[in-house]
Amino acid sequence: MKNIVAEIQGSYGPVNLAERVLQKIWCSGDFRRDNLKTCTGEKLEIVKFGEWNKLDGPDFKNVEILIDNIKICGDVEIHFYENDWNLHQHGGNAAYRNVILHVVLFPNPSGTPKITENSRGDSMKTLVLLPYLNRDLEEYALDEALVAVEMQLEKSESGIAELLADIPERERIDVLRERARERWQQKCFFSKKRLTEAGWTQFCHQIVLETLGLKHNRAAMSHLAQRFSTTTMLGMSAENLFNAEAGNWKSFPIRPANHPKNRLAQYLKLLEKNPDWQTMLKASVAHFQKIENATKWTQIFRKQSQLKRIHDYFKEQVFAGTLTGTRFETLMVDAILPALAGTTERDLFEYWFHWNLGDAPANIQKSLKNANVLSREMPMSNGLFQGVILLELQKSRSRKK
């Protein structure tokens, strides 16, 4: 199956978006699925997303949808543009005779679909995905690229040594800080955009559930946050919530602690112990003091800023001791700190950089130590990891050119 790539204009320049990313969005249901409408105005409900076909033919087989409450079964084909159907000559290909829904990313300039029949001549509806996406297109593309980079780094301890080999040892920390700063700016940009669209309370509700769903169940958790408010969830059990997304959970390969039912139970415990956590979270920015001429050395910064005290305040007070381990650290660096920066205009980069490492490849610390990056003054931190993955991403893109 050919993986077609389109170039889109992102906030940080052109971004390559693979058609596979669109297929993953459909497969995981990582878009707003309530109040879906076809291009011709019919109400669309998705009963089954179908099986992802990675061979020739339609992208998804055995899909079930409701069009104006009428059940229809068949296949789904996904493209960037409606006219890709003609460019790929699907209209004359019998393999596409059962397509019932054409999912496209971008709308037809005229606003009206021109392709309304599959290769058998039966009616085929069109859904434009762009208005229903949960996140910025650039964020989807970047996430996909970063997952590939993390998998690459996880495979080999020598990968980081090779990555840093052409950088003099005395400059490595500075280079990683520069890349980490870029990563921070990206996170803050995407966070601020989502904040503007959703509002503080809903945004917080969604990002915490999404983080608890990493990596395989982010979309299902996001959909739960859209369907049920925190108030509604308080009257539900983890079993109720789990069943509400029945058929959309990925139960492999995850550890028992990461099972969605256990993660939902954690979130319900947070709502029970601290129902006002979103308000407390917004006010928590006062705990971050402004440090002039902050040192780059993690050990010194953590002491100067009283970072452990701040860390424990979030863990024990805001999140009421309900979230622990690397998943709590991931929540803070991937969601909470960028969100606080986005809503208060405070530059929290140094705190984010020197924060504890969250979920990451198991060999990252040993690899950085072997590359002479880590020391007593520079223990492992979130920022070093973020710098590594963005540096690897940029170098991998350069190699492909």
Give residue spans per PLM region.
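Active-site metal-binding core of divalent-cation-utilizing nuclease and nuclease-like domains
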Residues: 44-58, 64-68
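A broadly used, surface-exposed interaction patch
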Residues: 59-111
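Hydrophobic, aromatic-lined core segments that form the binding pocket/scaffold
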Residues: 173-400
